[in-house]
């Protein structure tokens, strides 16, 4: 009974989180089930702290398990160049509105594991580079570098798309 309710309420959100970290949909689907099973097993450790706290707790489990899954796959470390101060200007907000969300998601999924993970943790989940470094076992500088490279790659994809669209 509790399993069904947990699945109905949180499976879609957990799956979306897992897909952000894992480029493979099948892996994300498998991990979604593992996250929900772990949440059920560990529910006695959950401390209610107001509306949304269960969702936040389950999201944290999903993020941690996604990162651990990537670690097990042996994250390929990107050689540390100096911070890439790319010269590609940020796309205008009105131009960004024309880029389909599915396309952005596919570009993010196409990043290397390290770049995608750092991008998600920093840009979407709000972690600092110091926190990301601790979570992934890399230096703060490596986190900054991976984010810069991810952003550069995404900006290049966006620029090319906008150019192809005549914008």
What are these regions (language model features)?
Residues 9-12, 21, 120-127:
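Short helix-capping/turn signature of helix-turn-helix
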Residues 16, 30-37, 52-64:
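Structural recognition of an alpha-helix C-terminal capping motif at a helix-to-coil junction
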Residues 20-23, 36-51, 72-74:
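Sigma70-family region 2
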Residues 76-104, 128:
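Internal acidic/polar
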